Amino acid sequence: RVYQFRHFGNGLEYAVWAFFCQDILPRRKKILSDPPSSMKIYTDIADINQHFAGACVTIGNFDGVHCGHQQLFAKVVEKARRCGGTGIAITFDPHPLQVLLPEGIKLISTCEQKIELIAMAGIDVLVIIPFTTAFAATTAESFVADLLVGTLSVQELVVGYDYAFGKGRSGNIAFLRRQGEIFNFPLTVVDACFIDGELVSSTRIRQLVREGRMDAARRLLGRNYQIRGTVQVGRQRGGPVIGYPTANLKFNPEDLVPKHGVYVTQVICEGQCYGGILNIGYNPTFGEEELVAETHIFDFHKDIYGKPIKVNLIKFLRGEQKFSGPQALAAQIGRDVLLAKQILADQSLQATLSCSEPHAG
């Protein structure tokens, strides 16, 4: 299938990456000042039947689309713009490790989030390859000759310092250099990305999220860690019983679950941003066994059951606790709300930037 991704935002979300990643992406502000209006998306290689002029290509899983990935995309966009060419990214869905490992892998971003973030980076064409055990048997030689050269007519390839692909991960940097000489395309290898002396990697970000260290995760992601989903009907006790109504989300098996407890949040609903607090856990006060994410949205009174929301996790407040009853729980939530509002007030500029969302004009 071929999709067209259109962006109608006012540009503030592009400033977020420039704001957080300016030390590692010195040209980022210039690139992001004129974001593309659309990105073409292919989910079937057979649908690619056009020639891409000056194809500058990168390949990766790009889970989280963190600052290291953004550095990679910036290089692709820079090279493509310089020659009037096309910036192309190739990625995979599901994540290869979800197919190849029995235990799978927990993902920082959904495929939907990944598409949005790659489009925001300025990429012109995104190829999403369905990853299967059959595709895993594809040799590196075949991948280069058939897809990169045969289908995309690659003119330049940009990869990360540790990238490898193909059966047995034989398509490493040395292999790609040899293939570039054979097929006459230059290879650019982007160095590892460090922020405050720490290597930026999806593995590290997953660890930080599991530990509830959202400030540290935000530095490496270049934005707040976000969960999203459709609001579910819960136990209906948040408003009537406790006095704090909640919008409830459920986790999928492949989702990365943050440390259980209470977080300060920003909630994006129907194009508007609100402050809030989020509890992730099992509701021990009421003896429940289902893992849920319950968000109380400040100064919000709409019925949003069945509607999508996005929740940015700003700061971990406290671990999940079992209280003596609803009154004790309500008293603690009241204290959580006061503290959360103060934290959001102290971060007002950052909150404004982080909550800027694409919207239909």
Give, region by region, the residue ranges found by the protein language model.
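Phosphate/ribose-recognition catalytic cores of enzymes acting on nucleotide-derived substrates
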Residues: 234-361
